[in-house]
Structures are given as C-alpha cells and as structure tokens.
Design a protein with these regions (language model features):
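Extended, charged low-complexity segments
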Residues: 277-337
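Amphipathic alpha-helical repeat scaffolds of TPR domains
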Residues: 67-84, 104-121, 143-154, 175-192, ...
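Extended non-membrane alpha-helical scaffolds
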Residues: 44, 149-159, 163
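Alpha-helical repeat scaffolds
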Residues: 65-68, 92-103, 127-137, 162-176, ...
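Extreme N-terminal leader/anchor segments
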Residues: 1-92, 301-307, 321-337
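Inter-helical turn/loop segments and adjacent helix faces that build the functional surface
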Residues: 159, 189-200
Length: 337
C-alpha cells in the first residue's frame, strides 16, 4: 500500500471560540458526557464480553478483564477498543500497576497501564509526558501491537503538535494499516486545519479521507471515512461560528462532492456491512447523521433501524448539542414518528 501524503506544514485551527480542542468523541467516551451513560449510549458498542468484563472490573473482580484481553489476541481494532474502555475505569491505573508488578513481562498489563494513564492525562489528572513514557514502555514489550501507539495518538490528538500526530499515526499505521480508531483521530485533528481560502467542498481532510478509503481493501470499514471527515469539518465550522448550530440547516452536505460521497458510502454499507467489527456502530451513526442532515430520510431510516439502541455520542453532540435529543429528533423525523 503506498503511503498517505505527509500533509505537513499546516497550522492548526481553533475548534471553538476559546481555542480549546474538542474531546475525542469518536464513540461512547466518558469525557463527552461527564462520565454518565444511559441505555441509549452503550460504551461497549454492543460487545457483550467487554460489558461483562467491565462490570466485573468495576466491582473489583479482575480475572474477566485478564481473560478478555488474552482471548482478544491480535484483533487490533477490538483490542484497542477493549483496552480503551477498560482503561477508563476509575481504578484501572492501580490495578494495572499491581498486575505489572506480578507479571513484569505482560504486554496486556503494560498496555492497560499505559492507556489508563493516557485517560488520566486527558482528564488533566496525569502528566502527559509520564503517560507517554508508559506507552513507550508498552510498545517495547509488544513491538507489533499498535495499541500503545493508539494511546500516544490519543494524547497527540488533544495535547500535541501536528507533527506528533502525524508521526504517531505513521507508526501505528505501519503496524495496522486499517486501524479504525486511529484514522478517526487523525481526521478529527486535520479537520481543524484552516481552509486556506479553498472552497467549502475542497478542504484537505476530505482529500485524505477519500485517499485512505480508496487505498483500503474493498470490504474495509475505512470506506466510511469520507462521511466522518464531513462530520468533523462541520464540528469545526460550527464551533468557530462559520456554520449554523443546526447541522440540517447548514447546507454542509448539499454540495456535489458531499452528495457523491454520501451515495458511495451508503452503497458501500449496503454491500459490505460488517456485523462483527467492534466499532461498526460509530460508522452507522455517522452515516445516519449525514443522511439526516442532507435531507435523505428514507436512507437515514434504514440506518436508524439498524442502529436500534446503539447510538454513539459523536456526531450527534457536534455543535455542542444534546446528543440524546439530537439523535431522537433525527430518528423520529426519518421514521415518521
């Protein structure tokens, strides 16, 4: 697979009037909802084994988490998702540290410890450099595992300069070229670049998303990246006052490029949907969001029926909206309720 373009030399755009970076809401992320969940937002993305392990972990019973990680093996997207979710448990750092003391060579323990410290750093409770050090240690223990690099990319996406984002993404992609979460993090950051006077439909994040989708295998969920890029760019435009807070009134999805992308991604989903992919609900929600905003209720209705109760905070929360209300409103409109 040829390398993606370097995309170096651009400065970053602020994401809201304060200049703060938006949190990583590429799924059910605690920080996006003050740590609260309800039946609408399932942090596990319908992963029953993860849900069981997470519940046991929160109750101080840790063997289920150890067994879960052992059996996940080198399914890298699933491993990254499961470790990220376990790392958000309140006592994950302490338990992972104890596990490492008992098994100093455990790659699972090291990865959990690293990602747990990353989560603390993202919440402002940990020195980011110390979190980076634990990720580097975990990467040495498992050189082929992209998960420690996922932790580094989560830090870079929110706290680091763009060159750190690009360099970390390159290392992660070398280990797993189709890493779903990594591509979403990269697009979220690159969507924050200024447009440089280019036309609204011509931002470079769209170019990158289409290139990555084209280079991936035909059945890869990365086919939906162009739709994700449009949502991330809308987030930036709305946060900086350059687009209406109501995405359906923004016209953001009405241009010829957006219409072509929506049609292609919906057609891809009809042919290639993967029921087993650990982050499939993120793609479903992005597609439903885009089709709703583009005024295509019949196609959106198909997605909403497929989503069922598995809504994800992003992109419904974009433009600082209540994601629950936004999801319910769009679903009711599409289904005619």
């Amino acid at each position: 697979m040829p390398p993606l373009p370097p995309l170096l030399g651009a400065r970053r755009a602020p994401t809201d009037p304060s200049g703060d970076t938006a949190p990583d809401c590429s799924g059910a992320i605690d920080g996006c909802f003050d740590g609260t969940f309800d039946d609408m937002f399932d942090a596990t993305f319908d992963d029953a084994e993860l849900r069981t392990a997470r519940t046991a972990f929160a109750q101080g019973r840790r063997q289920a988490a150890r067994s879960l990680l052992r059996h996940t093996g080198d399914d890298w997207d699933r491993r990254g998702h499961r470790l990220t979710m376990l790392a958000r448990e309140p006592y994950a750092v302490a338990w992972a540290r104890d596990w490492l003391h008992a098994e100093p060579g455990s790659a699972d323990a090291a990865a959990l410890y690293a990602l747990a410290r990353v989560q603390r750093a993202l919440r402002g409770k940990e020195d980011p450099d110390r979190a980076r050090e634990t990720c580097a240690t975990a990467a040495v223990l498992a050189p082929a595992d992209p998960t420690p690099w996922l932790g580094l990319l989560q830090l870079a996406r929110t706290l680091g300069p763009e060159r750190e984002v690009l360099g970390t993404f390159a290392e992660l992609r070398r280990r797993h070229p189709e890493h779903h979460h990594a591509h979403h993090l990269l697009l979220a950051r690159l969507a924050e670049r200024p447009s440089g006077g280019r036309a609204a439909d011509d931002h470079e994040v769209y170019d990158l998303a289409e290139l990555a989708a084209a280079e991936a295998p035909a059945d890869s969920p990365l086919a939906v990246l162009p739709v994700v890029a449009y949502a991330e760019r809308y987030r930036v435009l709305a946060a900086t006052g350059l687009a209406p807070a109501d995405p359906a009134a923004s016209g953001h999805w009405s241009g010829p490029r957006a219409r072509r992308i929506l049609r292609a991604c919906f057609d891809w989903w009809l042919e290639w949907e993967h029921d087993e992919h650990p982050r499939r609900h993120i793609d479903l929600n992005h597609l439903a969001f885009a089709l709703s905003c583009a005024g295509r209720p019949a196609e959106a209705a198909v997605l909403f029926r497929r989503i069922g109760r598995h809504a994800t905070p992003a992109p419904w929360s974009y433009a600082h909206r209540d994601p629950r209300a936004a999801f319910r409103t769009a679903r009711a409109r599409a289904l005619g309720h």
